[in-house]
UniProtKB/Swiss-Prot annotation:
GO molecular function annotations of the record: 5S rRNA binding; structural constituent of ribosome
Gene: rplR
Gene3D superfamilies in the record: 3.30.420.100
Identification of the protein by name: Large ribosomal subunit protein uL18
Stored Pfam families: Ribosomal_L18p
GO BP: any one term: translation
Signal sequence segment: none
Keywords from the named record: Ribonucleoprotein, Ribosomal protein, RNA-binding, rRNA-binding
Native source species: Carboxydothermus hydrogenoformans (strain ATCC BAA-161 / DSM 6008 / Z-2901)
Length: 122
């Protein structure tokens, strides 16, 4: 009998495998992405101190009124621009990109490219 694979469980395994190699430092923190069906979230994390330095999502009041639906590529681009803007304000220019076990495609790719256009280097 063929068992159906749980895609979220596979994603979590990929994420743990990647997290063994990638970690954020105070000089170069980690840009983490989480994607749900309706929203997308991004955080810049210093793993040494275990603190979130900057966060942005489609649930932010700044973006909530501008974008209608948070689960599309346009919303991901808006979150990427917002996270880059907030990071620059805190003096963060270089980050390590953590795609969270998701494929580098679609909304994750759009967020990353918008963050790069906003001035983040990774």
């Amino acid at each position: 009998m063929i068992t159906k694979t749980n895609r979220n469980l596979e994603r979590k395994r990929r994420h743990l495998r990647v997290r063994k190699k990638i970690h954020g430092t105070p000089e170069r923190p980690r840009l983490n992405v989480y994607r749900s069906l309706k929203h997308i979230y991004a955080q810049i994390i210093d793993d040494v101190s275990g603190r979130t330095l900057v966060a942005a999502s489609t649930l932010d009041p700044e973006l909530r009124g501008k974008i209608g639906y948070g689960g599309n590529i346009e919303a991901a681009k808006a979150v990427g621009r917002l996270i880059a803007e907030r990071a620059k304000a805190k003096g963060i220019e270089k980050v390590v990109f953590d795609r969270g076990g998701y494929l580098y495609h679609g909304r994750v790719k759009a967020l990353a490219e918008a963050a790069r256009e906003g001035g983040l280097q990774f």
